[in-house]
Amino acid sequence: MDIGKKHVIPKSQYRRKRREFFHNEDREENLNQHQDKQNIDNTTSKKADKQIHKDSIDKHERFKNSLSSHLEQRNRDVNENKAEESKSNQDSKSAYNRDHYLTDDVSKKQNSLDSVDQDTEKSKYYEQNSEATLSTKSTDKVESTEMRKLSSDKNKVGHEEQHVLSKPSEHDKETRIDSESSRTDSDSSMQTEKIKKDSSDGNKSSNLKSEVISDKSNTVPKLSESDDEVNNQKPLTLPEEQKLKRQQSQNEQTKTYTYGDSEQNDKSNHENDLSHHIPSISDDKDNVMRENHIVDDNPDNDINTPSLSKTDDDRKLDEKIHVEDKHKQNADSSETVGYQSQSTASHRSTEKRNISINDHDKLNGQKTNTKTSANNNQKKATSKLNKGRATNNNYSDILKKFWMMYWPKLVILMGIIILIVILNAIFNNVNKNDRMNDNNDADAQKYTTTMKNANNTVKSVVTVENETSKDSSLPKDKASQDEVGSGVVYKKSGDTLYIVTNAHVVGDKENQKITFSNNKSVVGKVLGKDKWSDLAVVKATSSDSSVKEIAIGDSNNLVLGEPILVVGNPLGVDFKGTVTEGIISGLNRNVPIDFDKDNKYDMLMKAFQIDASVNPGNSGGAVVNREGKLIGVVAAKISMPNVENMSFAIPVNEVQKIVKDLETKGKIDYPDVGVKMKNIVSLNSFERQAVKLPGKVKNGVVVDQVDNNGLADQSGLKKGDVITELDGKLLEDDLRFRQIIFSHKDDLKSITAKIYRDGKEKEINIKLK
């Protein structure tokens, strides 16, 4: 959006600023209008409103003017900031440069001032030696030209002279020393002529000399200009004595580069010896050379001497020491700066040339050493390989010789080893078979012990037959099953035998035929029976000593999977003394029993399950463990299609409780609460609604009838009550109710029952006596 005065801004920014401007202006107008309304009447207020609300065109013009002025002010601020930043950068750079070169500038200025003060002494000295110096102009001109070429293109000249000067001789060294001496003489003559001309001009020449000296101290590399001035002068010669002294001063000066810390002492000694000659002073370029290299006393030393590089810290330390030395020796060392600069430059160029030659020789030496070391390594590797091959050949030869000499003995030794291995395997197999036989013998011994116990048990198991076959109305096969069973002699007192068997075996007959294992028979009398436990006790008398009393075990210690033996007389006397083997398949089984054969279960019998073969006639037989002790009495078998070896035995501990009462009382007194019950599972929906049974109740019994003045009536039990829990145990049906009640036949204590009456849950105590 172009708003005039060369200001262009985005359209969105223009609109946003315009909205802000109008909003602020309207707010000010409203504020002014509100204040005017408080001070003037309604008519005046309306006129004021018309004056305050200006034309929209005026608003846009005011906005553009305001925005343009704002942008101009912003541009001015930006330009001022940039100018300030550039100025600050320049100030910082100048301050840095000023600080960086402050030390050198101070020393150079001090040298120039000191040189001006001693111009008179210098002029006198140079006048005395001017004639001798002019005679050597031609020689100095040639050598100075050669030095300029070497300094301008030192890399090229250095590479060309490296091959020629790689091994300098003594004659070459002397030649270089003479050239250096002649160059120093030319430098001194050049400076003498210049100072002589300047001294003739008086005060004007002194100012000119100070400027020349300061320029030379600030710009050391300007050797070409001084050479041109020397070329315009006449040649001079110096005595041989002055050449030697100047060479000694030059050597003393080079010592200062090598020994650093002893520089001041060497210079002071040199000045004392040459007090009537020109003292030496190092310029800035000499400082650079001293910072980068360390040289010997002799500048023309052997070119193989390596140059060592200094670190930044060492260079800074040398600079500081050099500046301090210059300040200390300004009064004595500022005479002939031009001469010293030229002589030092020529010395430095020669030294650099020698160093470049030295570096080239070192490089060639390194290459030669590298090739030599590579060849040596290759030779070593080849020699090692040859030695390895020779060693392998020697080993193979040794093995061949050894085999040719001792092969019969080795064959015999291998045969002996193989024979030993075969015999060891045979003996191990024999020992293994012996161990297996021992194990089998041990098993056979155990089996023999078990069978011995079984044979003893057979002497305690008898056949029990009643006499119902003559007058029984049952079918013959059914009658024979009921008439024949087995019994166990659990106690013997003299000739009196006490035999336990099943109640369904003795039936209703009082007298029973008892047949022993030796086929002798006696008549026994039934002392008592209990249909709820399906047990009966028969008493018989026999003087046969072969009949033995069975050992009683403990049924509370039975273990699932424990081996057992079943001894009985299946199918009568013809198969008496049959022994079958099995294990205990289950514990604490509740087996429903139908005693009266009306297809309705009468009682839950507590028993353990066995898988030994049980057949008709085994009822009342003995279940013994491997020790031959009685642990149970065979009571029932499940006879269903596709069901095999599922038989049940009454635990011997329960048997002992029952037979004790049967011996003395002939019966078992069970508590009778005087109720008749129905199972909840057999109720229909109408009967469930009649007793108001909750839907969550699935198992239990419903009281159908309560005897007057019976234990149930006395306990508060009523018809229609639903019993779901008895003595803390869940009640499934009426068989479970009878089993729990009969389990308290010995203590006859009251038990707690949980019932539902009219749909409400409650607890009552049922009396058992």
Swiss-Prot record:
CDD domains: cpPDZ_BsHtra-like. One of its GO terms (cellular component) is plasma membrane. SMART domains: PDZ. Its EC number is 3.4.21.-. Residues 21-64, 71-108, 138-186, 264-296, 310-330, 348-364 have a biased composition (Basic and acidic residues). Signal peptide: none annotated. One of its GO terms (biological process) is proteolysis. Its main location: membrane. It comes from the Bacteria. Residues 126-137, 247-262, 331-347, 365-390 have a biased composition (Polar residues). PANTHER family: PEPTIDASE S12, PROTEASE DO-LIKE 8, CHLOROPLASTIC. Belongs to the peptidase S1C family. Residues 1-20 have a biased composition (Basic residues). Keywords: Cell membrane, Hydrolase, Membrane, Protease, Serine protease, Transmembrane, Transmembrane helix. Residues 1-390 are annotated as: Disordered. InterPro entries: Chloro_Bact_Ser_Proteases, PDZ, PDZ_sf, Peptidase_S1_PA, Peptidase_S1_PA_chymotrypsin, Peptidase_S1C. This is Serine protease HtrA-like. The active site is at 504 (charge relay system), 534 (charge relay system), 619 (charge relay system). It is found in: Cell membrane. GO terms for molecular function: serine-type endopeptidase activity. It is a single-pass membrane protein. Residues 680-733 form the PDZ domain.
